Regions:
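Conserved nucleotide-cofactor-binding alpha/beta core module
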Residues: 56-170, 178
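Class I SAM-dependent transferase core
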Residues: 1-66, 72-80, 95-106, 175, ...
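Active-site capping/gating segments
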Residues: 159-201
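Short, charged/polar low-complexity linear motifs in solvent-exposed/disordered segments
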Residues: 38-40, 83, 196-199
Length: 201
């Protein structure tokens, strides 16, 4: 099946409304970001479709979903990987970790889960490498911490300074990643909470 067809099938199988707060569900068909609390949003469906097409998730892939929010993209990614793959959603807002986790559990895909982001770190370095990384928040520059979590030949899709980038890791240690630009987009900012302060007796 072509990439676009697989993504459309995922979007049909995983309805957006199940990942929206009750007050936003009447807007489920609106092609716009919708608020989910704490200044965060459930992304615009056409943007999600385009990002998933660029990511080109394959069955069995290990996938990282940065800024997982409501859990919608986490479950879409899990549909694309199938049960032979795995998806880790990372979210920094505790209330959204709980909201997204509940939504992922309700979807019945145990190979996907949401965890709270580590202070001062992007992604899930202890669970790397990943074949695919999706970032649903805008970085001011290419987040090398996330590039380093890619498997050889892995793909990162991330908005950077308004541009959507598709970053492909080198298949060996002889070169840096290949970076392609794919249009202009607007997202909430990518943020890492400060590292925990060391305890002083």
């Amino acid at each position: 099946m072509a990439v676009a067809s697989r993504v459309d099938a995922a979007l049909t199988a995983v309805p957006r409304e199940r990942f929206l707060p009750p007050g936003q569900r009447r807007h489920r068909r609106r092609d716009a970001p919708l608020p989910i609390g704490h200044g965060q949003t459930n992304s615009q469906p056409t943007t999600v479709r385009q990002m998933l097409e660029l990511l080109d998730v394959q069955p069995g892939d290990r996938v990282l979903d940065v800024g997982s929010g409501s859990g919608w993209t986490t479950v879409l990614l899990a549909w694309l990987t199938g049960a032979q793959g795995s998806v880790v959603g990372v979210e920094r807002v505790p209330d959204l970790v709980a909201f997204g986790s509940a939504n992922v559990r309700a979807a019945g895909m145990p190979w996907a889960h949401v965890r709270e982001a580590l202070p001062g770190r992007f992604g899930a370095p202890s669970q790397a490498p990943f074949e695919r990384i999706l970032v649903s928040a805008q970085a001011p520059e290419l987040p090398l911490d996330l590039v380093s979590q890619l498997a050889p030949g892995g793909v990162l899709v991330v908005p950077v300074a308004g541009r959507m980038l598709r970053v492909t890791a080198s298949t060996d240690d002889t070169g840096g990643p290949a970076v392609e630009e794919h249009g202009w987009y607007r997202f909430v900012p990518l943020v890492a909470d400060p590292p925990d302060e060391p305890q002083v007796d």
